[in-house]
A protein has these predicted regions:
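Long, non-globular low-complexity/IDR segments in eukaryotic proteins
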Residues: 1-6
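Short, solvent-exposed mixed-charge patches
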Residues: 66-67
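Beta-loop motif signature
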Residues: 9-39, 43-44
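Extended, charged low-complexity segments
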Residues: 37-38, 54-56
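A short macromolecule-binding patch
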Residues: 55-63
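Short, Lys/Arg- and Gly-enriched loop/turn segments at beta-strand edges
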Residues: 44-51
Length: 67
């Protein structure tokens, strides 16, 4: 995989969105602080992530710390 990098969530109860925008009807699921994720895309203040179980979505960049 190109540019494979990992991150860890540093905010409690991070909402994961269907795209790089913050809308209530776009929330797919939530993840807890300390969850490790793989970073797919970094776009402005948003990051597309994938979880170990294959769930994907977008989170605000400030909720993530690169590992």
């Amino acid at each position: 995989k190109m540019n494979e990098s990992q991150g860890i969530l540093i905010d409690n109860h991070v909402s994961v969105f269907s795209g790089p925008f913050q809308k209530n009807d776009a929330i797919l699921f939530r993840v807890n602080e300390g969850t490790k994720v793989e970073i797919l895309v970094w776009e402005n203040q948003w990051v597309e992530i994938i979880l170990i179980d294959g769930k994907k979505g977008w989170i605000p960049a400030e909720t993530l710390r690169k590992l």
